[in-house]
Structure formats: structure tokens, C-alpha cells
């Protein structure tokens, strides 16, 4: 392993994303999979429990020493808040109440956003649609790092820093790559979040607010669960741009590890994704997969072939009216 990543550009391809064709083939062969495209009634209750757990944690940490507050923010709060962000991910696909009740899904996402400390649920939904429709799309898929990230974060130390700062890159990258007009829902999301933060501060003081913010920053940064950010689409093997992970961390992440299955069928809630693989194993079992998100992070930092540039990119031709 050298001191600098060996890649100097993204992996440019001139083919369509593989998920579209695989989806057609699987549905033609196994039409019963359509029955999995239904709302998950468990999702709203899981969100309620996670939010209440963090509110209880806010009350418990109000008198803790700062060092212990930060410890629990990483060890416990980071897991809960990261789980909530993945609930928001599922909700962005209308998994809680179905496409016919979009408003209920949006407000559940805003509610799930409360322990995260900063408003982002409405913005996430706005951009996540493009991630699926234009996977790896130049100037469209804001999940792909910028050229500046690829150029600068090219050594083990810098890649480690990049992982620590993931929450900032995911928040700021859309504004640079594909800025969009602010929506009414984003404004409401912000107002509700600010009101919640102020209420927590008024009730229990500064420490619970810091606990929630630290839980988000630490839990979405250099954290075992954050391995999924890298595991999902970074090119560990040439020719493959999406990878699944079938390990135990799926239990607390709404099966986000079933990522190939998710991109094949975005309308299937995370709870049902294991059934997709069970019904159509010949489409998934032979694909390369990850077995440890921690190992993913280790390899990303120390393997020369990996870094922010290790992403597949393609150019999409859009209609004149844009998105």
C-alpha cells in the first residue's frame, strides 16, 4: 500500500445502471414480488420508539460530565440517530403509509428527524429520488463525491478525515453539485426542528442538545454503522457499482445492507427486502457482497485503489424541462 490513492478520476461508464434491467427480469420471472410493494406498518412504531428513547436519553444526560456525554453520544446515541436517518430513508420511499398518503410519510419523516438535531428529512427526500433515477449521474447524483473530494482525500490520513467529516459532505455536497429551490416542506421541517431544539434546551439545558447533535455527528461519521455509506456504491470490484451486506447490523438499520435489492426495488420497504433475495436467489447470491462494515472502512482508508474517486459515473441526457 502506498501513501496516495492510485485513482485520479472516477470510473466513467457508458451503460445504463444495472438495476433497471434486473428489475424487469425478476418481475417477469417472479411476479409475486409485486406483493412485497406495500407499506410497512411496523415502521411508524419503530420510529416512535426510537424518538422516545432519545428523549429519555436527553433527560438522563442532562447532569452527565461532558466526557461521559460524548462517550454515550458515540456508543449509544450515534446508533439510535443513525438508525433514525435510515428510517427516514425508508420513509422517503413512502414505505410507512404508501404512495397514496404522501403527506403522512413526509410528516413522519419530520418527526423522525427530531433527535437528529438539524433539519434534513425534507431535503433528503428531494435529492434521494435522483440518486435512484440517475445512479452515478454526473451533476445529478449527489451521493457521488465531488472532484475536489477525490483529488484531496487521497492518502490514508486524509481518507480517515473524510470519513470523520461525512455528515458535512452529505449536507453540503447537494448545494454545490445540484442546487435546487427550497421547498415549503423544507421550511416547515426547519421550523419544527428549531422549535424542538429550543424546547429541549428550555426543559433540560444545553447538554441534551449537544448530546443529540454529537450523536448525529459521531454516529454518521467514523462509526461502525457508517460503513454502509462506503459499502453501498464504492467500487471495491471493477464492474460492480452496488453491493449488499447481509450481516447483523441490518437488524438496527432497516435492512439498508440489502442495497442491491433496494435499488432493484425501491418501492419495497426495508423489512421485506430479505424476501426479494429469498424469492430470486439466483440474481443475488453470486454478486460480490460485504461481510463487515468495519472492514469496509478499514479497506477504504488503507487500500490504494479506494477513495472518493472509486465511484462509477455516467452522463444522463435529460429532458429540456430538467427534473
Curated annotation (Swiss-Prot):
Location(s), subcellular = Endoplasmic reticulum membrane
> In chain numbering, where does the motif Histidine box-3 fall?
259-263
Tissue expression notes: Highly expressed in skin, intestine and kidney.
The region called Required for C4-hydroxylase activity is annotated at 95-99
What Gene Ontology terms describe where this protein resides (cellular component)?
A: endoplasmic reticulum membrane
Q: What EC class is this?
A: oxidoreductase
Which residues are annotated with the lipid modification N-myristoyl glycine?
A: 2
Q: Motif Histidine box-2: where?
A: 128-132
Instruction: Give the reactions, separated by semicolons, that this protein catalyses.
Output: a dihydroceramide + 2 Fe(II)-[cytochrome b5] + O2 + 2 H(+) = a phytoceramide + 2 Fe(III)-[cytochrome b5] + H2O; an N-acylsphinganine + 2 Fe(II)-[cytochrome b5] + O2 + 2 H(+) = an N-acylsphing-4-enine + 2 Fe(III)-[cytochrome b5] + 2 H2O; N-octanoylsphinganine + 2 Fe(II)-[cytochrome b5] + O2 + 2 H(+) = N-octanoyl-4-hydroxysphinganine + 2 Fe(III)-[cytochrome b5] + H2O; an N-acylsphinganine + 2 Fe(II)-[cytochrome b5] + O2 + 2 H(+) = an N-acyl-(4R)-4-hydroxysphinganine + 2 Fe(III)-[cytochrome b5] + H2O
Pathway terms, separated by semicolons: Membrane lipid metabolism; sphingolipid biosynthesis
Primary localization class, coarse: endoplasmic reticulum
Any matching Pfam family:
FA_desaturase
The EC number of this protein is: 1.14.18.5, 1.14.19.17
The residues that cross the membrane are: 45-65, 68-88, 210-231
Q: One MF term in GO for this entry?
A: sphingolipid C4-monooxygenase activity
Tell me, in a sentence or two, what this protein's role is.
Bifunctional enzyme which acts both as a sphingolipid delta(4)-desaturase and a sphingolipid C4-monooxygenase.
Provide the family line.
Belongs to the fatty acid desaturase type 1 family. DEGS subfamily.
PANTHER family recorded for this chain? Answer: SPHINGOLIPID DELTA 4 DESATURASE/C-4 HYDROXYLASE PROTEIN DES2, SPHINGOLIPID DELTA(4)-DESATURASE_C4-MONOOXYGENASE DES2
Q: What is this protein called?
A: Sphingolipid delta(4)-desaturase/C4-monooxygenase DES2
| Naturally occurring in which organism (per UniProt) | Homo sapiens (Human)
High-level lineage: Eukaryota, Metazoa, Chordata, Craniata, Vertebrata
Amino acid at each position: 500500500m502506498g501513501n496516495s490513492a492510485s485513482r485520479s478520476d472516477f470510473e466513467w461508464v457508458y451503460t445504463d445502471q444495472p438495476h433497471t434491467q434486473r428489475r424487469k427480469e425478476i418481475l417477469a420471472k417472479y411476479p409475486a414480488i409485486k406483493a412485497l410493494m406495500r407499506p410497512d406498518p411496523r415502521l411508524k412504531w419503530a420510529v416512535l420508539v426510537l424518538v422516545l428513547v432519545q428523549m429519555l436519553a436527553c433527560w438522563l444526560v442532562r447532569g452527565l460530565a461532558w466526557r461521559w456525554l460524548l462517550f454515550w453520544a458515540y456508543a449509544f446515541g450515534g446508533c439510535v440517530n443513525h438508525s433514525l436517518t435510515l428510517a427516514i430513508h425508508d420513509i422517503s420511499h413512502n414505505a410507512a403509509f404508501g404512495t397514496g398518503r404522501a403527506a403522512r410519510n413526509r410528516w413522519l419523516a419530520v418527526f423522525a428527524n427530531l433527535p437528529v438535531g438539524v433539519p434534513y428529512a425534507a431535503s433528503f427526500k428531494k435529492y434521494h429520488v435522483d440518486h435512484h433515477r440517475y445512479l452515478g449521474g454526473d451533476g445529478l447524483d449527489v451521493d457521488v463525491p465531488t472532484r475536489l473530494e477525490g483529488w484531496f482525500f487521497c492518502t490514508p490520513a486524509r481518507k480517515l478525515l473524510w470519513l470523520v467529516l461525512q455528515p458535512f459532505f452529505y449536507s453540503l455536497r447537494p448545494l454545490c453539485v445540484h442546487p435546487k429551490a427550497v421547498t415549503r416542506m423544507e421550511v416547515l421541517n426547519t421550523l419544527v426542528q428549531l422549535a424542538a431544539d429550543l424546547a429541549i434546551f428550555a426543559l433540560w439545558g444545553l447538554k441534551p442538545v449537544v448530546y443529540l447533535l454529537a450523536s448525529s455527528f459521531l454516529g454518521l461519521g467514523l462509526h461502525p454503522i457508517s460503513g454502509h455509506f462506503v459499502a453501498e456504491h464504492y467500487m471495491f470490484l471493477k464492474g460492480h457499482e452496488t453491493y449488499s451486506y447481509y450481516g447483523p447490523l441490518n437488524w438496527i438499520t432497516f435492512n439498508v445492507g440489502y442495497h442491491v435489492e433496494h435499488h432493484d426495488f425501491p418501492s419495497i420497504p426495508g423489512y421485506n427486502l430479505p424476501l426479494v433475495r429469498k424469492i430470486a436467489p439466483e440474481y443475488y447470491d453470486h454478486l460480490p457482497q460485504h461481510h463487515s462494515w468495519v472492514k469496509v472502512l478499514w479497506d477504504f482508508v488503507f487500500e490504494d485503489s479506494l477513495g472518493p474517486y472509486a465511484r462509477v459515473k455516467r452522463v444522463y441526457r435529460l429532458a429540456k424541462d430538467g427534473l
